Amino acid sequence: MASTLNDKRWNGALALVTVLAACTKEPATPSRACLQFSSDLMPLFAGGMIRKDFRVSNAWAVKSDSSIDSAGVKLPAYFLSADIIAPNGEAVVGTWLTTAVTQPGLVYSVSPQAKKYSTWAQTGAADKSTAGFTTASPGAKESITCVLNNRPKTSTTSIPAKP
C-alpha cells in the first residue's frame, strides 16, 4: 500500500510541475483581428480609384502595432485590404494604410495593386511618418488574408495577392 501511495504522490507532484511549467511559458502571439471597414465609408474610399468603372468591396482592416505621426499627433494605423473589381468581375486585392475604419481618415497606398489602381498617396511619399509601412509590415498580410477568407464563394477572381 505504501508504494502505491508514494506513486500517487509522485504523479501528483509531476502533474503540478508540468502545470507550473506550462504557466510560465511565453504567451502565444495573439492573432490579429479582422475589422470590417465601415460600409458607410466605401463610396468615399472608392472615390480614390483611378478608373471609375472599377469598384472596391469586401474591405477588411487589421490594426498595426505602429502609429502614424501626423503633424505631431499620433494616429492609429490600420492596414486596409479590399477587392478591386474590374468591370468584367475579375478581382485583385489591394492594400492601403488608413487612420480610421469607422470614420473618414487619412489613406495611403501600400501594395503595388493599390498604387496602380488608386490615386491615394503612396506610403512614405507625401508623409514621411508612413515610410516604414510596407506589405511586409505586421498586419498587412493579415488584412489580405481577411479579404481572401471573406470573399463571396461566387466571385470571379484572379490570382490572389500573396498573404
Residue ranges and their predicted role:
Residues 2-12:
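Bacterial N-terminal signal peptides that target proteins for export
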Residues 27-85:
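N-terminal secretory signal peptides
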Residues 79-163:
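Extracytosolic low-complexity repeat regions of secreted or lipid-anchored proteins
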Residues 21-22:
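C-terminal motif of bacterial Sec signal peptides marking the signal peptidase cleavage site
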Residues 17, 27-28, 140:
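Processing junctions and N-termini across compartments
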